[in-house]
Amino acid sequence: MEYRILGKTGLRVSRMGFGGIPIQKIDAERTRQLMLQLRDAGVNYIDTARVYTVSESFLGQALEGIRQDFILASKSMSRDRESMARDIDISLENLRTDHIELYQVHNRSAADLEKIGEGSFVGHIFVSHNNLLKN
């Protein structure tokens, strides 16, 4: 597997990642088998979201004992700081982890991004679908 450093994060991620949305089509046991296969193939980047139904919870179960082998990314569509903090807490619980390396936010103002808590439970914050110039 080839790896790249992700921007200025310092994170070494596999060129091939896994998008967690298809997990809703399989069960928790098959999710565990899939994570072991991905790890053995050298894939270390997993993207998920609470809106992907069972994805985070199945991944949380599946990564037990092998969490350190993966870089997790999740996201939120929340529009205010309190909702975002709640989303992060729920994702941490679902994923059975104490941190998420990459957290993607939608619809946030530039001023609010500084308040979310980058560096504590969230390693790095990425912005998408945002019009920062108007905020």
Model features per residue range: what roles?
Residues 1-70:
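N-terminal binding-site loop/beta-alpha segment at the start of enzyme catalytic domains
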Residues 18, 48, 74, 102-105:
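Conserved beta-strand positions
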Residues 19-29, 73-85, 109-114:
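Active-site mouth loops of central-metabolism enzymes
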Residues 36, 82-135:
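Glycine/proline-rich, positively charged
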Residues 52, 79, 106:
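Active-site beta-alpha loop architecture of Rossmann-like, nucleotide-cofactor-dependent enzymes
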Residues 56-75, 122-135:
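Alpha-helix-loop-beta-strand connector modules within alpha/beta enzyme cores
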